[in-house]
Regions:
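Active-site-proximal beta-alpha loop/turn segments in soluble metabolic enzymes
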Residues: 73-84, 108-124, 153-166
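Short, small-residue-biased leader/transition segments that mark boundaries at the very start
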Residues: 1-2
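Stable alpha-helical structural segments in soluble proteins, enriched in small hydrophobic residues
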Residues: 19-35, 138
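Mobile "lid/hinge" segments at catalytic clefts and subdomain interfaces of large enzymes
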Residues: 49-112
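A short glycine/serine-rich beta->alpha loop
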Residues: 6-18, 116-119
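Catalytic core of soluble alpha/beta enzymes
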Residues: 125-314
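Active-site phosphate-binding and catalytic loops of NTP-dependent enzymes
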Residues: 34-42, 136-143
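Glycine/threonine-rich beta-strand-loop-alpha-helix active-site module
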Residues: 38-53
Length: 315
């Protein structure tokens, strides 16, 4: 696809259009994979293949739901299981408990954009308490069996240098303190987009403070862009990257971003988008590129479940 990119001649592929270029890139990569290998997930070699740990959306907020919760996603990671089948089955038990608890409180059990519930809870603390209680009621242990990840999507509540979060206006340092308190109290694995993508000094601060404890994931910060990732690595902004094919526009560049991240001890998280199809290519690519994590919604909606089904077939 490099020749096609060179013909386009623009940094953001605006001449031919990123969607058109990505469609061609995907079609070529699939054809090449099936012509030379038995499957797409074998296209980058057969040694040290892993099944990524799923980050399953259980509660939606922010722009993905019609409620008062400012954080966009609350996810659970089934880390203490011997197989993907066992991990997903255990996750289903936790989700069932969440639904039961919401119904007992007469709260909405409709689903958000990515398959998680979208109840109108009072705060992020209410959501985290609900998730932890549901894990324990299912017979599992916090930290041993499940951890929690957040997508703060902080750019959505950032304005004029302040984070307008749950009725309060916070400076960068104050917002970092909010995250520190969360990490002290709950089994947090990662926080995505904890700060605004242009709050560069803030990213350095939060990485210094929380980086040794959790994964700080750059989505808006990096947008799967190799140059932005290089800057983040050099400046010590975040320690993980969200990988989205249609942000960068070609499979080749996506693989290069993952390679750069891996070489610099950044975790790569293969990700869906909020608007999805039933195509399961990202499941294959996550395995092929040895991504340790995959983020593709909840165990609901066919466009999300299709990715998990493909991972199950691979496993």
């Amino acid at each position: 696809m490099y020749k096609r990119q060179d013909l386009d001649g623009t940094e953001n592929k605006s001449k031919f259009g990123a969607n058109a270029i990505l469609s061609l890139s995907l079609a070529y990569y699939k054809a090449w994979s099936y012509s030379n290998f038995e499957a797409i997930f074998l296209s980058q070699g057969t040694e040290n293949l892993i099944i990524p740990v799923p980050m399953l959306n259980v509660i939606n907020g922010g722009q993905h739901a019609d409620n008062e919760v400012d954080f966009q996603e609350f996810m659970i990671l089934p880390i203490g299981f011997n197989s993907l089948t066992e991990a997903l089955s255990s996750t289903h038990s936790v989700i069932t408990n969440i639904k039961k608890e919401l119904k007992s409180r007469s709260l909405n059990t409709n689903l958000g954009d990515e398959g998680g519930f979208a109840p109108n809870l009072k705060s992020h603390l209410d959501v985290l308490d609900l998730i932890c209680d549901s894990i324990l009621k299912a017979g599992y242990k916090l930290n041993d069996h499940f951890k929690i990840s957040l997508d703060a999507a902080s750019s959505e509540f950032y304005s004029n240098g302040k984070y307008n979060f749950e009725g309060n206006s916070y400076s960068t340092d104050e917002m970092i303190s909010v995250y520190e308190n969360i990490c002290d109290k709950y089994p947090i694995f990662s926080i995505e987009d904890a700060l605004n993508e242009e709050d560069y000094e803030g990213w350095v601060k939060i990485t210094s403070k929380l980086g040794p404890k959790i994964r700080l994931v750059g989505d808006d910060l990096f947008v799967t862009n190799i140059q932005k990732l290089k800057t983040g690595i050099d400046e010590k902004q975040a320690n993980s990257i969200l990988i989205k094919l249609n942000q960068i526009g070609t499979v080749t560049e996506t693989l290069e971003a993952i390679k750069l991240a891996t070489e610099n001890n950044f975790a790569s998280i293969m990700s869906h988008r909020s608007g999805e199809t039933e195509d399961s290519f990202i499941s294959d690519l996550a395995v092929a590129s040895r991504c340790p994590l995959i983020k593709t919604g909840s165990l609901a909606r066919s466009d999300r479940v299709a990715k998990y089904n493909q991972l199950l077939r691979i496993s």
